[in-house]
Design a protein with these regions (language model features):
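SF2 helicase catalytic motif II
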Residues: 166-168, 172-215
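Conserved pre-motif I regulatory segment
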Residues: 4-65, 82
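Intrinsically disordered, low-complexity accessory regions that flank the conserved helicase/ATPase core
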Residues: 1-11, 20, 24, 88-93, ...
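Walker A/P-loop NTP-binding motif
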Residues: 35-55, 73-101, 123-128, 168, ...
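Conserved alphaE helix
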Residues: 60, 154-158, 162, 202, ...
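Conserved nucleic-acid-binding Ia/Ib motif block in the N-terminal RecA-like helicase ATPase lobe
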Residues: 27, 89-172, 180-183
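Alpha-helical interaction elements in eukaryotic regulators
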Residues: 14, 18, 30-34, 73-76, ...
């Protein structure tokens, strides 16, 4: 469309570091889905130098319906990348004792299948490279649970991508800390809200973002 050809990621408020990473991955222009979602989600969380009243405003939630290949995955990943960049910059100013308390996952991405979860992780790694691997933990059923538990303890990841059963299991065990989740993504929500996922999704929904000022966005 003409709007997509005239808008860039920078125009939408995406920081230069992330624009450069997208370009290096061969992603030059935002898709229609990204043009619709990014203005709603980027900069919705206030920066660290703004006052508490502004920071505690409720976070926006959006629902998106789009076809395969529309760029939907990056439409929700790019705002997460922006949050992580902002938090990394804030952490550089913290002392060691303050950093010790920054252990919670910040973004939870729930998918109905192993295949979709792995595809999302590949997208993160395509854009962020080795750093993406360092900050992301995959939690999917059918894979080695002990290894995933060790990954959570060792990495202290910013992003968790997984299937409902394994995420809920790790949460019940107390290994996965979700009260600091500021973004919950329910990918293919029509499948995830079906009856066979209902119990696990209820737990995920209840626990994610409990400790976030102004609540999480979904």
């Amino acid at each position: 469309s003409s709007s997509s050809s005239s808008s860039s990621f920078a125009d939408l408020g995406v920081p230069k570091q992330i624009v450069d990473a997208l370009r290096a991955a061969g992603i030059e222009k935002p898709s229609v889905a990204q043009l619709a979602a990014l203005p709603e989600l980027i900069d919705s969380r206030t920066s660290e130098d703004e006052n508490d009243a502004a920071r505690s405003q409720s976070m926006p939630s959006i629902a998106m319906q789009s076809h395969t290949g529309s760029g939907k995955t990056l439409a929700y990943l790019i705002p997460i990348f922006c949050d992580i960049l902002r938090e990394e910059e804030a952490m550089e100013k913290m002392d060691r004792n303050q950093k010790r308390h920054v252990n919670d996952v910040r973004a939870m991405i729930v998918a109905p299948s192993q295949e979709l979860a792995m595809q999302i992780v590949r997208t993160i790694e395509t854009v962020l490279g080795p750093y993406g691997r360092d900050i992301t933990q995959q939690l999917i059923g059918g894979a080695n649970a002990r290894r995933q538990e060790q990954g959570l303890r060792k990495k202290r990841p910013f992003i968790v991508v997984g299937t409902p059963g394994r995420i809920a299991e790790m949460s019940r065990m107390g290994v996965l800390k979700t009260h600091g989740v500021s973004t919950l993504v329910i990918d293919e929500a029509d499948d995830l809200l079906a009856s066979n996922f209902r119990r696990d999704m209820a737990r995920i929904n209840e626990h994610c973002g409990k400790g976030v000022k102004g609540g999480r966005r979904t």
